[in-house]
Structures are given as C-alpha cells and as structure tokens.
C-alpha cells in the first residue's frame, strides 16, 4: 500500500505553527496533500486535526497520562524518568524536552553532531505511526498500561527528534497547529476539487458525514463528482443547521419571505435521533454520542418513530412530572453521570420535542422544503405527551407572531424560532443562515439577545478574587477568516463556585502564547485555546479601539464590544465554531443603532 514518510507531515506541521495568514496555511496544506497518496490522506487529515478519528465514533481515547508519557520517553532515550522530568521542567514543554533528549541520546550513540542527526531519515511512515497510535488507544483492560507504554516507547525510539516532539504533542492533545476545518476544506478544494469554486460541494459532504478524513479520501481517490453523491447515513451524525437572530417580528417575516412556521424554542439539549431497525443513536449538537444518557428516549424512539430508517431532530427538555413545568438546560447536566442513570431518569425525567426530519427510509430529506419535511415527520411520529412535535403555528402576520412569542415565554420556553417555508427552505446542514431565525429577548438588558462567545484568555483576580482567575477574554468566530476575534473582557455574573472551577476548566487549554486562530490586541495574563463557549449578556453593543471583532467594518480602527458584559452560563453543547459570529454582531449593532436613531427621532417629534 502506498505510504509517505512521517517526516513530510512533521515538517509541514512545523511550518504551520509559524504562520497565521490563512493563505499561507492553505498553501502549506496544498503542498502536503499533493505529496500524500490518496490511500492514506484520511490519516494525514486526522493527524493534522490532532485526532485519530472523529469524536462521534465513540472510539477510545489514547489514555496516556503524564506519568506514562514520561516513562515511555525515558525508555526511548535510555535515561531515568527523573532526567525527563527535570528537562521538561527546565524547558517548560514536554514535547520540546523530548526533542532535546532524543538529540542528545542519539548523537551519543552515533557520534554525529546534534544538527547532523536531526537531518537523518527514519523508518517512520504516516501509516505505521498512525496504526501504532491506534493500538495504544485500543489497548484496554489488564496489562494495558504497560502495553501502551511499550508501544509508545518503541514509536519514540524509532522517531527522529522532530518526529518525537510531534508524537509527544499529539499524545498530550496539544498539537496546536491553529487550523480549523474550514482551512483544511479550502486546501482540499484547491488540491483535488478543481479550485475553491467547488468548496461548497466539499462542505456539504462534510456537513452530512462529519468526517473530514473520509471526505478527503473520497475526493482524492474518486473525485468531486463522487463527493456530490454523498447523502445522509443512519448512525452518522449530520452537522446541525443553525439560526440567525432578530428581535422584530416584521423584520423576521421579511427575512423568511413573508410567511413562516413559528415554533417554540425550548431550553434543552438539541438532539439528533437516528433509527435503523431496532437500533437507536442519539447525537448532541456537538456530534457527541449521548445515547447512553437517555435510555428512556431510546425506548420511546424505538416505539414512536414509525419507520425502518429515519433521522429526526428535536430538543430534549427536563420537566416536572407533577406540574408539567419545563426545567432549564442546566438540569440536563445530571444526565451526564455515568452511574445510576436509572436514578437520574426518575429524578430528571425528560420530554422530547421534535422539529425536523432529515432522512427517511433511504431518501435524503435535507434537500426538501420544510413543509414537506414537517408533513412527513407528522406522519411517522406516534405522538405522546413525552415524545411529540414542537408546538408551532404557520403565520404571515407580525402581530400573530408576537402573540405566539409572548405565549411561548409564558409557557416557560426561551422564545421562538421562525423558519422559512418557501420552495428553497431546505435543511442547510452545518450552515447558519436566514432560513431559521431566533426570536428571543432578555428583558433585563438593552441587548436584544444573549451571545455565545469563546474563551481565548484569562486575567488574574484582585482583592477577594486574588490568587484565582477573575475575568475572561471572550471572542466571536469570524467564519470568513476562520479565526476568533476578541469582543470583551467579562468578570461579572460568576458565582464563587464558577470561579473556583475555572483553574481546572482552563488547565488543559492554557498555552504560552496566543493561539494562531486568535486575533487580539489586548494581552491577557494567560492565553487559552479557543475551546470553551459561554453565554454572555450585556447592556449594549459598542465600538472599541482595543477589540478586534469586525474591526474596521463599522468604523476604521474600531471593533465591536459589549458594554457591561455579564456571564450567564457555560455552553458545553456548543463547539467554538458554533459561537456567535463577527458578522452576526455587526448586524446586531446596526439594528441597535437603527433602534436608537428611531427613538431619538420620536423624542424630537414629541
């Protein structure tokens, strides 16, 4: 089987770590992909992503802790574990320490200078490296710890110093290349897809299969036409369609084409339920397999979905069985427990509110208009009180929309979702657009809605908060540039227990310099990988010379910021790329400005 030296991948990774411009990142990836045999391009894509396989597959993690890693390095370099720990402490990076220790150990063995040895080829290839890492992950049960150490030590022993650094960083989960899926798709389009004009074909395939390695392999080996044939597959999560937001019923109906389905927006966990015969899979909006958390939903889905094969989407919400009252999203956290799930079912019972159908008995429904999808959904669901269709109306009247919204708020939900129902109202997997619009208001704030922002840095607290983190640097996602742009520094809204948990939450993501995908002019005390998402509210959107969100779009040398930002809650159900986008904040700011101007004109007339 065709293969490629690991050295080529490692050299590319090193180059990628030194640049931030997307054009350069794409150029380096294109060069790498051109050298990669189609048979192994899936493995190359996974390794660039820093994974062995997509998370949704539910495969084991590597399971190598720091002590095991140190033991493997000591065996590979034929030195004591204490020496490994000492070097890692001096350098502050166990990957770089491994590189140095390999250079020293192997130059002694060969008599070559350190520089000369770094140039020596090794026998490691992408395939044997990937396969060994898979063996490490799959080693389970009695004796697995020693087996993992031996396998990793053997891999490091055969590696060059630079390859060893790469392997250690991969095992640590700290392969911080700064490349998002969007950048990889750009490179695939240029290399195999006939140019960026065919990028939408690649993106749709990825949004339906949620596996960039698989998409790359089909594209590289069979071409763009084969990729166009991809459709949903039961058991493989589809990336969820996302909504824009507005706070004016008239504007909402204009955007949806004059008419819409308007449905309750429940404060629960978005879930994609797959059925194939007597098998059920449930995936979260982050594509995590959450089937084990909801055995009660599995039972209902098997009984109530009247189809051999189907993919439906809805919201899982905790409720009070005595009063029927719907509970907030946070209550679902109790379902995350791995033990006593039956007890959790009794204490935190759930209802399922379905709102879409994506696949039915071999037929792709994502390309059908919403009314067709909804009609088919109604036909296959045997509705009960705890497994039903989301409450909705069809309207072209803004007053009726507002009345339904107020009714929804009164019934304890977050707001409503307005969804276009014209002939082009397809299900846009993985896309945020105007076919779906959130209408949701926080009456305690001048801001029309909360926003979801990504943590990119942290500041140490003062006074009562001394000795721990007191504030976080938050960023929005710029989809066009595939970067995160700072919006605000948030230090209020946190409970003491929130602040107490911050060090442990941030520890896996702390880095010694700004992440390549973060655009910031403000310097926090600690930089953080853009991973954690939080819901934020504020008094209003404003312009700031120190924040980079949509900088220069509204006003030269000024970005969009939030005045008096306040932490609401963590959003573990959202990926960083699901955060509020820079373009959304531009639209929110412009609507806010329009509202203020209108109110001022009214006051002047009075």
UniProtKB/Swiss-Prot annotation:
Annotated keywords: ATP-binding, Cell cycle, Cell division, DNA damage, DNA recombination, DNA repair, DNA replication, GTP-binding, Ligase, Magnesium, Manganese, Metal-binding, Nucleotide-binding
Q: Which reaction does it catalyse?
A: ATP + (deoxyribonucleotide)n-3'-hydroxyl + 5'-phospho-(deoxyribonucleotide)m = (deoxyribonucleotide)n+m + AMP + diphosphate; ADP + (deoxyribonucleotide)n-3'-hydroxyl + 5'-phospho-(deoxyribonucleotide)m = (deoxyribonucleotide)n+m + AMP + phosphate; GTP + (deoxyribonucleotide)n-3'-hydroxyl + 5'-phospho-(deoxyribonucleotide)m = (deoxyribonucleotide)n+m + GMP + diphosphate
Q: Which cofactor does it need?
A: Mg(2+); Mn(2+)
What Enzyme Commission number(s) apply to this enzyme? 6.5.1.7
Task: Please verify whether the record's keywords include Ligase.
Answer: yes
CDD domains for the chain: Adenylation_DNA_ligase_Arch_LigB, OBF_DNA_ligase_I
Residue numbers annotated as active site: 265 (n6-amp-lysine intermediate)
Q: Which GO annotations describe the biological process of this protein?
A: cell division; DNA biosynthetic process; DNA recombination; DNA repair; lagging strand elongation
Activity across pH: Optimum pH is 7.0.
What are the temperature characteristics of this protein's activity? Optimum temperature is 75 degrees Celsius. Activity declines drastically at temperatures from 75 to 80 degrees Celsius.
Q: Which GO terms describe its molecular function?
A: ATP binding; DNA binding; DNA ligase (ATP) activity; GTP binding; metal ion binding
> Which positions bind ATP?
263, 270, 285, 315, 355, 432, 438
Q: Give the stretches traversing the membrane.
A: none
- Summarize the protein's role: DNA ligase that seals nicks in double-stranded DNA during DNA replication, DNA recombination and DNA repair. Can use ATP, ADP and GTP, but not CTP, TTP or NAD(+).
UniProt lists the family membership as follows: Belongs to the ATP-dependent DNA ligase family.
HAMAP family, per the entry: DNA_ligase
In its UniProt entry, what is this protein called? Answer: DNA ligase
